[in-house]
């Protein structure tokens, strides 16, 4: 039943949130015209009476505000009763004028100075001058009258008059009244704001959790016409849909109303749905509408002008029950063939989803068997423990024979001088069992010459398929009426007699021949056989292809018509003659039985065709063997895919169950192509055989490898029979690649993204969802209920039961390497250094800190970790490179005393370098020991050293000191490879590996895949559907990699296979390091990882030291000149206008970005501790913006007092008087963005912690460690020192180490050119490319250098270095790699060639320096080569 006009209007009022307004309830919608092309909606409304102005304005505002983003809104109002026109007409005057569409500056005059009065049935407008009256001509008056009529008035006559006597009085009265009204509006607005704030505070408190089913608006009956989302293609006034919510969010608008936006799919498509809140009850319901619900929604479909997409505005929302798939079988099956999203670009669900589903269905166990990898094992183990289900750990491996035979039916007969029959068959398909030979051709050769030939067609007894005709060029007319197969085969036997038989990929042809002979009651071929395909692979392993036409072209043998048997045979014969001559000359092969002596050589595993097999670990020892096998496949036997030779599997088969896998397994392939006998031979290798539901094999029918479902059933039944014959269990498996049937599309998108490179794109993908026991029994019902139950339920459980319980792929604790005497060594290093700094008798605070840390470090077995770090740092320092510490290692005083970090975590203190006197400030008097004023030692008068950053040890190893230390070290990027290799020196190559990573499909990449799928399938998908499909494709493994710094150390009492398989990153067999196969995060708690990072700062420091001869460790941390750059650039001899920066920190690490420079401008730090604050504030999340920044601006606190680093919280709270454990718990919770833990806020208030501090803690999402900030600031100050006092040294180092992009022309031409280039980039704003933005940073430093009185010189062909900027007087000479488009390798080649001898000409430079003509032209244009002639000149004298 359709809605009445008034009911439609009430629906509209609900949408615009005015349903409760009584004065609007009598309205109705007379008409709505939608102009699709212009995106304009025109409403026609009717009311009983003219609406009061305030009601009308609110109605108009809400109407436009709600639908204005979808279309341009127009309207007209008609009223039944034209009552109170006089009152309303004057009220509406201002609105009428402003919305009349009249464009004139006199409009404001009409609003402010013209006073209307309704008199004698007309609106008299009294104005105070003739100009205004003249403006109100007939056209203007008619427009104003029409506007009145549009909002519900009848035709109104408007008469302008001039009233000089009363105009001013009336104007004054009007303005007084207007002031009163404005004051009332302000008061009302103020009350509204207070109400909104009160409402916000109430909403900030935890809203009561909604229980029960969601119901908003009217119920939606299941019998309603539920529309499938794919059928929604245009705007609709009202539709009902049902689906699954896959995304939901609630936004709070500026009006304080909430907007619910959620996305629903019914798996035919998806749509975005919106609804505005009307009251707090709505908001409570909004919080209950979350991802995972099934809902029915009724609403209108509208084109969203912002999203450019159809969306739904919801009227009613109703949660509904949705029946998930259930496994109702009494006896449950076990899935033994299951892929996760760790099967590269081939499966979509994480193992946790799959294990969870198996547990929900009551399955006793489930196996994980990804393609060639085990990377899902750690998560599978955790998921199994969580779900209480037995997890079997397996892999779908690529098995290969160690070598493929060259000769068959071996016989000791000479290869030279004999007769050869080279034959080829053309067939109707690939199966010797189900397809037929349609042409058999052969040539008989002797000494390389054809002496006879054989050529016969065979009538197969049925029409040829189009595929066969296209491939073989044989038609029905050619075979119709030919001899039968038996006749031709008998005739051929006479032809080949006692000859050696040859074929290219001969196993295929021999398979058809032998099957045919057996079919007709004759013997199989017994003659010696040679396969030229494997012979060619053995002799010429580096060729890229071995197809017959490829080899013929390579060796100059004619091939008249490929894929016609007689031509292929003759070509094969000539090739065989050449190959056998080569085999004799190179390997001494003279007899047939010698051919296979070399079949495992020349990486023969690469040429064997991989067949799939399932390997499942039966015992813990078997799991380790599985780790070894997968490692071999990735490291030793990788070729296109990881491969496992059968011989290697045989050696490590103990504890492993081997299954025959899918249609790519050799048992199924043999049964399909060669028959029962061949399949029987192969089946003996396996512990169980697999069969799969017919839908899984459907691509075989599509590819014409199997003719139809009947033949497919026959193959499956034969494999079941084969299992019975051999007493090998047959198990029904699902080849699972996703969880639910509707997830098929995600896999399709992944496969589509790989194009023709993936053979799965050649046919429709099969249905490979995770099947229930019921589904599986139904799939195999054609075998009968008893057989189906046996292979689906009984045998799958039998295999699962044979696997030991408790197998674990991950360890339960950390296994650190052993270094004899590590405990004593760390203690000795620490104590020796402490005594050297603080005296023979250590101060109590020093002794206690050392004792506390050493007890924890030694007691928990962490000494070796410290010692490794100490040795690395010591070696780097010895080799001339400083090391910076990252993270929280600077929180450990033992790390400081053992030389791992420069950061001293003790409270700020003085210490005397001569007599070791010390004095500590333990109550927060100073933020850093580097800020202590200069002071002489009271004992000996020596100037004392300030030190100590006041960092608690707990931030490093936890409150109990038992957290595994994570020591991150910043080595110079130049030195990092040396540091990595030093780990191999310390522990041995077999005990050190790079930390492996797994690269998965990211959101943006998935979006690209979906868009490509949309294009390739010629579809138009809504944005919500694209988002859903992208979500389904994210998280899937794409590749592997390595952590840029992580080195994993295997203890010498174990081997790597106790923790993880190994591989090369991204399967790059040329990589220098092997990595762990498992992502390092999954074994982080089991094996020690050292983060040996590469960083520019230590490289920069080394370069500055080399150029200046100054030891960076002697640079003061409180130099006044250096401190000035953080407040302004004047100390550099420039002002802010010259360098376009209000600070002098351009190019200073940590302090050179626009964001941090802005912080410096607001705070003007003058001390080390304040710089620490800046570093912490700039790296944290919600620590500065909206937090500390506001507190400082408001004058509540200073920079020194705000919360800057995470450690500040613990120390601040201790200084306020809280106990250390409470302080630690608060710090840990706040730094992770969890706010103040429940119950601790009262403790803080009891300790008189200020409100601002408590509120600040509540805003923080992430915090930076103070030790990390300390190390960074120390490096920054050292670099800044050179910038202030050794500018050319600084700039030479900066441009050499930190800069990658240059505009050498602008730089060399001087200030004006450089500033113009900078302006060009700045003018682009956000449109500037990343490269341009990086260049701008470099140009800012270049500009600063020029403004300080220095200059750049263009590349000098005689002086320039390959990559280093050279100082010459007050200039820097640019290196060759500053040339646009010239890489470092070419730059080095130029320098090397120049060192050999000077360049004689541009031609000489181009040849010996390998310089392109483009670069030659560039250098010529910029006078770099002005001294060189174009070509070498020959001198006779």
Swiss-Prot record:
Location, primary (coarse class): cytoplasm
Example of a GO cellular component annotation carried by this entry: cytoplasm
InterPro entries, per the entry: DNA_pol3_alpha_NTPase_dom, DNA_pol3_finger, DNA_PolC-like_N_II, DNA_PolC-type_N_I, DnaE2/DnaE/PolC, DNAPol_HHH, DnaQ, Exonuclease_RNaseT/DNA_pol3
GO BP annotation list: DNA-templated DNA replication
Cited SMART domains: EXOIII, POLIIIAc
Record-listed E.C. numbers: 2.7.7.7
Pfam families the record matches: DNA_pol3_a_NI, DNA_pol3_a_NII, DNA_pol3_alpha, DNA_pol3_finger, HHH_6, PHP, RNase_T, tRNA_anti-codon
Subcellular location, record wording: Cytoplasm
Molecular function in Gene Ontology: 3'-5' exonuclease activity; DNA binding; DNA-directed DNA polymerase activity
Domain Exonuclease: residue ranges: 420-576
Keywords, ordered alphabetically: Cytoplasm, DNA replication, DNA-directed DNA polymerase, Exonuclease, Hydrolase, Nuclease, Nucleotidyltransferase, Transferase
Reactions catalysed, as given in the entry: DNA(n) + a 2'-deoxyribonucleoside 5'-triphosphate = DNA(n+1) + diphosphate
HAMAP family listed in its UniProt record: DNApol_PolC (MF_00356)
Entry function: Required for replicative DNA synthesis. This DNA polymerase also exhibits 3' to 5' exonuclease activity.
Family: Belongs to the DNA polymerase type-C family. PolC subfamily.
Protein known as: DNA polymerase III PolC-type
Organism of provenance: Pediococcus pentosaceus (strain ATCC 25745 / CCUG 21536 / LMG 10740 / 183-1w)
Lineage: Bacteria, Bacillati, Bacillota, Bacilli, Lactobacillales
């Amino acid at each position: 039943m359709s809605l009445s006009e008034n009911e439609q209007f009430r629906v509209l009022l609900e949408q615009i949130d005015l349903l409760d307004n009584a004065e609007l309830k009598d309205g109705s919608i007379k008409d709505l015209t939608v102009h699709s092309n212009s995106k304009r909606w025109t409403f026609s409304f009717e009311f009983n009476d003219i609406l009061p102005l305030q009601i009308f304005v609110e109605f108009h505002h809400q109407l436009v505000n709600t639908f204005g983003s979808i279309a341009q809104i127009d309207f007209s109002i008609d009223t039944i009763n034209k009552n109170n026109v006089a009152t309303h007409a004057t009220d509406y005057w201002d609105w009428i004028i402003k919305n009349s569409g009249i464009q004139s500056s006199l409009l404001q005059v009409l609003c402010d100075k013209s006073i209307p009065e309704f008199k004698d049935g007309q609106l008299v407008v009294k104005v105070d001058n003739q100009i205004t009256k003249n403006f109100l001509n007939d056209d203007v008056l008619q427009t104003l009258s029409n506007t009145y009529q549009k909002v519900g008035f009848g035709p109104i006559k408007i008469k302008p008059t001039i009233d000089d006597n009363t105009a001013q009085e009336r104007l004054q009265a009007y303005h007084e009244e207007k002031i009163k009204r404005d004051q009332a509006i302000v008061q009302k607005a103020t009350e509204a704001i207070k109400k909104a704030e009160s409402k916000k505070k109430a909403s900030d408190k935890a809203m009561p959790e909604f229980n029960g089913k969601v119901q908003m608006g009217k119920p939606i009956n299941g019998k309603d016409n539920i529309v499938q989302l794919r059928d929604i293609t245009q705007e609709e006034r009202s539709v009902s849909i049902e689906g699954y919510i896959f995304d939901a969010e609630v936004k709070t608008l500026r009006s304080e109303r909430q907007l619910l936006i959620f996305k629903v799919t019914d798996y035919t498509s998806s749509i975005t749905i919106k609804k505005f809140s009307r009251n707090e009850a709505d908001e409570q319901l909004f919080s209950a509408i979350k991802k995972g619900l099934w809902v029915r929604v009724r609403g209108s479909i509208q084109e969203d002008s912002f999203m450019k997409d159809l969306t739904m505005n919801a009227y009613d929302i109703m949660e509904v029950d949705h029946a998930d798939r259930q496994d109702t079988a009494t006896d449950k099956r076990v899935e033994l063939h299951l892929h996760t999203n760790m099967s590269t670009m081939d499966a979509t669900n994480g193992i946790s989803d799959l294990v969870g589903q198996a547990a929900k269905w009551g399955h006793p166990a489930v196996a994980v068997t990804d393609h060639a990898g085990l990377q899902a094992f750690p998560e599978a183990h955790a998921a199994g423990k969580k779900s209480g289900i037995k997890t079997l750990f397996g892999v779908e491996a690529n098995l290969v024979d160690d070598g493929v035979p060259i000769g068959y039916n071996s016989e000791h007969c000479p290869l030279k001088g004999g007769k050869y029959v080279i034959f080829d068959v053309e067939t109707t398909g690939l199966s010797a069992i189900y397809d037929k030979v349609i042409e058999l051709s052969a040539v008989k050769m002797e000494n390389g010459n054809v002496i006879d030939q054989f050529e016969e067609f065979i009538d197969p007894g049925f029409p040829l398929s189009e595929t066969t005709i296209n491939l073989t060029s044989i038609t029905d007319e050619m075979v119709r009426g030919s001899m039968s197969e038996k006749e031709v085969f008998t005739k051929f036997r006479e032809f080949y007699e006692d000859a050696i038989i040859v074929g290219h990929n001969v196993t295929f042809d021999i398979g058809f021949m032998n099957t045919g002979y057996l079919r007709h009651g004759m013997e199989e071929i017994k003659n010696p056989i040679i396969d030229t395909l494997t012979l060619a692979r053995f002799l010429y392993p580096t060729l890229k292809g071995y197809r017959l036409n490829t080899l013929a072209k390579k060796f100059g043998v004619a091939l008249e018509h490929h894929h016609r048997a007689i031509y292929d045979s003759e070509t094969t014969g000539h090739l065989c003659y050449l190959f056998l001559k080569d085999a004799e000359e190179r390997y001494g092969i003279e007899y047939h039985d010698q051919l296979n002596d070399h079949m495992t050589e020349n990486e023969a595993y690469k040429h064997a065709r991989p067949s799939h097999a399932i390997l499942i670990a039966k015992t813990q020892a078997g799991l380790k063997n599985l780790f070894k096998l997968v490692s071999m496949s990735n490291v030793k036997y990788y070729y296109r895919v990881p491969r496992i030779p059968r011989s290697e599997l045989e050696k490590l088969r103990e504890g492993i169950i081997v299954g025959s896998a899918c249609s790519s397994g050799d048992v199924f392939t043999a049964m399909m192509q060669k028959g029962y006998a061949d399949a029987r031979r192969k089946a003996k290798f396996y512990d169980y055989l697999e069969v799969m539901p017919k839908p899984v094999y459907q691509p075989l029918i599509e590819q014409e490898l199997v003719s139809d479902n009947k033949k497919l059933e026959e193959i499956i039944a034969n494999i079941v029979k084969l299992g019975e014959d051999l007493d090998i269990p047959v198990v029904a498996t699902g080849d699972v690649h996703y969880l639910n049937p509707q997830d098929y599309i995600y896999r399709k998108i992944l496969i589509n993204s790989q194009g023709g490179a993936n053979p799965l794109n050649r046919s429709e993908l099969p249905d490979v969802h995770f099947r229930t026991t019921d589904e599986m029994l139904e799939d195999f019902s054609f075998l009968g209920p008893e057989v189906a139950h046996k292979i689906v339920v009984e045998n799958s459980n039998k295999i699962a039961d044979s696997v030991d319980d408790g197998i674990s792929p991950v360890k339960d604790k950390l296994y650190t390497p052993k270094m004899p005497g590590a405990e004593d060594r760390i203690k000795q290093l620490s104590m020796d250094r402490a005594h050297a700094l603080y005296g023979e008798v250590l101060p109590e605070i020093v002794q206690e800190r050392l004792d506390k840390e050493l007890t924890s470090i030694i007691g928990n077995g962490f000494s070796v970790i410290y010692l490794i770090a100490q040795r690395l740092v010591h070696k780097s320092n010895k080799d001339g490179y400083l090391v910076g510490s990252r993270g929280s290692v600077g929180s450990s005083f033992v790390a400081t005393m053992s030389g791992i970090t420069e950061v001293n975590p003790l409270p700020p203190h003085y210490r005397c370098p001569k007599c070791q006197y010390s004095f500590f400030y333990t109550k927060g008097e100073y933020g850093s020991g580097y800020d202590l004023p200069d002071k002489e030692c009271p004992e000996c008068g020596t100037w004392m050293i300030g030190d100590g950053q006041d960092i608690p040890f707990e931030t490093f190893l936890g409150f109990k000191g038992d957290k595994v230390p994570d020591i991150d070290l910043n080595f110079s990027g130049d030195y990092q490879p040396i540091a990595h290799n030093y780990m191999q020196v310390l522990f041995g190559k077999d005990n050190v590996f790079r930390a492996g990573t797994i690269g998965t499909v990211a959101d943006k990449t998935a979006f690209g895949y979906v868009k490509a799928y949309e294009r390739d399938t010629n579809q138009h998908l809504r944005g919500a559907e694209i988002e859903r499909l992208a979500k389904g494709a994210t998280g899937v493994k794409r590749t592997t990699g390595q952590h840029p710094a992580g080195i994993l150390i295997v203890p010498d009492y174990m081997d790597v296979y106790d923790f993880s398989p190994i591989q090369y990153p991204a399967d790059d067999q040329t990589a220098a390091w092997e990595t762990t196969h498992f992502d390092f995060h999954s074994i982080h708690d089991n094996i020690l990882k050292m983060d040996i990072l590469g960083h520019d700062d230590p490289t920069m420091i080394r370069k500055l030291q080399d150029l200046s001869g100054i030891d960076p460790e002697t640079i003061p941390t409180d130099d006044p000149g250096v401190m000035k750059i953080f407040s302004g650039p004047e100390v550099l001899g420039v002002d802010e206008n010259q360098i376009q920066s209000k600070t002098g920190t351009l190019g200073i690490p940590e302090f050179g970005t626009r964001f941090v420079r802005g912080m410096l401008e607001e705070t003007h730090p003058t001390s080390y501790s304040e710089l620490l604050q800046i570093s912490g504030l700039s790296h944290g999340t919600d620590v500065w913006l909206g937090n500390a920044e506001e507190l400082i601006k408001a004058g509540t606190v200073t920079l020194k007092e705000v919360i800057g680093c995470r450690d500040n919280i613990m120390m601040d709270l201790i200084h306020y008087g809280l106990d250390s454990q409470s302080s630690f718990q608060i710090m840990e919770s706040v730094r992770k963005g969890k706010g103040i833990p429940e119950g601790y806020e009262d403790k803080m208030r009891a300790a008189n912690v200020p409100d601002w501090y408590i509120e600040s803690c509540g805003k923080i999402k992430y915090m930076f460690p103070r030790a990390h900030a300390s190390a960074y600031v120390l490096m920054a100050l050292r670099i800044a020192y050179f910038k202030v006092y050794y500018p050319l040294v600084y700039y030479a180092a900066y441009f050499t180490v930190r800069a990658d992009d240059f505009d050498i022309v602008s730089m060399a031409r001087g200030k004006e050119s450089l500033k113009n280039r900078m302006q060009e980039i700045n003018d682009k704003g956000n449109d500037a490319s990343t490269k341009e933005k990086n260049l701008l940073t470099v140009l800012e430093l270049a500009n600063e250098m020029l403004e300080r009185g220095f200059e750049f010189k263009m590349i000098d062909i005689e002086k320039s270095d390959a990559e280093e900027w050279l100082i010459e007087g007050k200039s820097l000479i640019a290196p060759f790699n500053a040339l646009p488009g010239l890489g470092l390798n070419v730059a080095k080649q130029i320098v090397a060639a120049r060192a050999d001898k000077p360049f004689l000409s541009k031609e000489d430079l181009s040849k010996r320096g390998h310089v392109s003509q483009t670069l030659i032209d560039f250098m010529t244009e910029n006078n770099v080569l002005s001294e060189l002639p174009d070509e070498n000149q020959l001198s006779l004298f």
